C-alpha cells in the first residue's frame, strides 16, 4: 500500500512523513564459461567489461524482484518469490534466496533514531563467475499519496559510490544512496511506472504508483567466492557532508539493531516468545516529538500521528508493561505541554498545525494513564515526578471540567459530565460530513 516502503522519513518528527526509498530490486546473472581470466577481481576481464558498460555473455539470469504492475489493462507479476527459501523478522527483516549455485541473504533494518535504511547482503557464489545488479527505487511523496513520472524533480549527483538526490520541492533535504562497492550506470527505463498496490486496489482505488530509478549498480561475484555488500539510504541536510559507508556499514547498523532489540527484551523482563513479539511491536509506536523534545505515541499509525485518546489508552501496554519508565514519563510530559483550557489534545495534525481539542475523554484517559504509572512505580521518585510536573495540570483539568470549558464540556448538578452540542465531534465516533454529524455523542 502507499504507506509502505524501505524508508519513510519524518522530516519534522513525528510529522512530514515522506516515502523516499521505496525498495530495491535484485537480479543475478551467471556468466558463460568463456568469461575467464585472472583470479584477481580487479584484473578480471568481466570487471573491465562491466566498467565499460558492456554485458558479458550470460548462461542464466535470476530476477529476484517480486512486484505487481498494471500493463495494457492487465495485471502482471514478477516471480522473485520462487527463489525465496526463508524469511524472518526480529526487529530486522531477513530474506534468503537460492538461485542456482548462488545463495543470497538480504538483511534490512532501520538505524534507530535516524532516517537511515541499511541493507546488508551476504552472498555465497558456489558456481561460476556472476554479478548482482541492484536497482534502487526512489520517491519523494507524502506517505499516503501516490506518484506519477511528472512528479519527480531532482537535482542528481553521483560521486564514486554515493548517489545524491535533492528534491526541488525541498532543496534543503537530500536523499543519499551509498554502496560499499559496485559500478553505477544509467538505468533504463528511468521510471518504474504503474506499480500496483493490491491493498489500495482492495480499497477500490486504482492503486497505481510510480518510482524513480535513474541508476543501477552492478557488483561482480567471482566464482567460488563469498561477499558482503553494504547499502545505505539516508535522508540528510542538503549541505551535510557525505558519511563514509566504510565507517558505519550496513552490518554495523544491523548489529546495533540486534543489541537494541535485545535491550528491549531485557528491559521488559518477560521471557516468553509471544510476549517478546509484543514488546518488539510496541516499540514501533513510540517516537520522538520535535516540538517537545520528548517521546510520544503514533497511536494512529500509519494514517495518523499522536492522538490524545488513543495514546492514553495504549499508554499502559506500550510503556508500563514493557518497563519503559522514562518513555512513559516523557509521554505524560508531551501531552501536559499542550493542555489548553483543561483539555488534552485530541490530535496533532500531520502538517505541523496547532493541535485540535475536540475531545471529551482524552483528559479523563490522561488521569487514568497517570494513575497506572503510579501503580506500576509506587516509589518516591514517581510521586515526585507527578507532584512537580503533572499534578498542576490535573488540577487544571478538574477545574475546567467542573466549571465549564470548550465544546460545551461541564459538570451537571448530578456530577455527570455534559459534553458537546451542535456539530461538535467530541468522541471517538467523530464522523462528520459537512453539517451532518453521523453519530453524535452529546
Predicted regions and their residues:
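Aromatic-lined, polymer-binding surfaces characteristic
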Residues: 271-278, 284-292, 304-307, 334-367, ...
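The feature captures the catalytic groove of carbohydrate-active enzymes
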Residues: 194-216, 230, 237-239, 342-365, ...
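Terminal accessory carbohydrate-recognition/targeting modules of carbohydrate-active enzymes
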Residues: 1-267, 302, 309, 320, ...
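Alpha-helical support elements that line or immediately flank enzyme active sites
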Residues: 302-338
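Active-site flanking loop/helix segments enriched in acidic
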Residues: 295-302
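Extended, well-ordered alpha-helical scaffold segments
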Residues: 244-264, 270, 274-281, 323-337, ...
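Hydrophobic core/packing positions within alpha-helical solenoid repeats
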Residues: 315-318, 366, 370
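An acidic intrinsically disordered interaction segment
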Residues: 78-90, 185-195, 266-287, 325-337, ...
Amino acid at each position: 500500500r502507499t504507506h509502505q516502503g524501505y524508508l519513510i522519513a519524518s522530516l519534522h518528527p513525528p510529522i512530514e512523513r515522506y516515502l523516499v526509498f521505496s525498495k530495491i530490486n535484485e537480479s543475478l546473472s551467471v556468466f558463460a564459461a568463456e568469461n575467464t581470466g585472472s583470479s584477481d577481481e580487479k584484473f578480471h576481464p568481466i570487471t573491465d567489461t562491466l566498467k565499460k558498460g558492456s554485458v558479458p555473455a550470460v548462461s542464466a539470469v535470476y530476477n529476484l524482484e517480486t512486484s505487481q504492475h498494471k500493463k495494457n489493462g492487465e495485471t502482471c507479476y514478477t516471480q522473485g518469490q520462487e527463489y525465496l527459501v526463508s524469511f524472518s523478522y526480529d526487529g530486522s527483516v531477513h530474506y534468503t534466496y537460492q538461485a542456482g549455485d548462488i545463495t543470497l541473504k538480504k538483511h534490512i533494518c532501520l538505524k534507530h533514531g535516524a532516517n537511515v535504511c541499511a541493507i546488508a547482503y551476504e552472498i555465497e557464489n558456489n558456481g561460476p563467475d556472476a554479478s548482482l545488479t541492484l536497482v534502487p527505487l526512489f520517491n519523494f511523496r507524502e506517505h499516503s499519496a501516490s506518484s506519477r513520472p511528472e512528479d519527480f524533480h531532482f537535482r542528481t549527483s553521483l560521486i564514486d559510490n554515493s548517489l545524491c538526490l535533492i528534491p526541488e520541492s525541498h532543496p534543503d533535504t537530500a536523499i543519499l544512496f551509498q554502496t560499499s562497492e559496485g559500478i553505477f550506470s544509467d538505468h533504463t527505463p528511468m521510471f518504474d511506472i504503474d506499480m500496483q498496490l493490491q491493498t489500495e486496489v482492495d480499497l477500490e482505488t486504482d492503486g497505481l504508483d510510480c518510482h524513480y530509478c535513474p541508476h543501477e549498480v552492478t557488483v561482480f561475484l567471482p566464482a567460488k567466492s563469498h561477499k558482503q555488500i553494504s547499502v545505505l539510504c539516508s535522508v540528510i541536510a542538503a549541505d551535510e557532508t557525505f558519511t563514509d559507508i566504510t565507517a558505519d556499514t550496513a552490518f554495523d547498523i544491523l548489529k546495533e539493531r540486534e543489541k537494541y532489540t535485545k535491550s528491549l527484551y531485557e528491559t521488559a523482563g518477560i521471557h516468553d516468545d509471544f510476549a517478546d513479539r509484543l514488546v518488539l511491536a510496541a516499540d514501533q509506536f513510540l517516537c520522538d516529538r520535535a516540538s517537545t523534545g520528548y517521546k510520544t505515541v503514533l497511536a494512529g499509525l500509519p494514517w495518523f500521528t499522536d492522538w490524545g485518546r488513543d495514546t492514553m489508552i495504549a499508554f499502559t501496554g506500550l510503556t508500563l508493561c514493557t518497563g519503559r519508565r522514562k518513555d512513559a514519563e516523557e509521554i505524560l510530559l508531551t501531552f501536559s505541554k499542550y493542555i489548553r483550557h483543561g483539555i488534552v489534545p485530541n490530535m496533532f495534525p500531520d502538517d505541523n498545525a496547532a493541535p485540535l481539542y475536540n475531545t471529551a475523554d482524552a483528559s479523563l484517559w490522561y488521569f487514568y494513564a497517570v494513575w497506572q504509572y503510579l501503580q506500576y512505580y509506587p516509589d518516591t521518585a514517581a510521586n515526585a515526578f507527578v507532584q512537580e510536573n503533572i499534578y498542576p495540570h490535573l488540577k487544571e483539568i478538574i477545574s475546567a471540567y467542573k466549571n465549564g470549558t470548550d465544546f460545551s464540556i461541564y459538570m451537571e448538578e448530578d456530577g455527570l459530565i455534559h459534553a458537546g452540542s451542535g456539530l461538535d465531534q467530541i468522541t471517538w465516533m467523530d464522523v462528520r460530513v459537512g453539517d451532518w454529524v453521523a453519530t453524535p455523542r452529546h
